[in-house]
Amino acid sequence: MQAIGTIFVVTSTYPNLTDAQRSASELVKRGLSRCAQVKGAVTAYYEWQGEFSEAEEYVVDFKVSEVKHHEFYAAFMELHPYDVPQYYWSEVKASPHYAEWVNTPLVHEDQ
């Protein structure tokens, strides 16, 4: 059996479905994320600039290779509509085949 592989899963939230889908699509098309999953709406409760807030947000999980992580982050920040977006990642274990797929450069990157 092959060794377990490793990938990064980056999680963020967006103020609406359109922004979530746009970022997910663009980051995958640029080859910076191998897969992005836009999840349904959640309700966020938070303090921002001294005020209590409640907002509907959309969660997106991006699958990113360790090699692409810094480039992904720069593009993510460029595309995200929030001044201070939620951005956290986990290094996770994945099946060997899935990790290989996430970590293999896209075909159009070599052209």
Predicted segments with their positions:
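Positively charged, small/polar-rich N-terminal and surface patches that mediate targeting and assembly
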Residues: 1-111
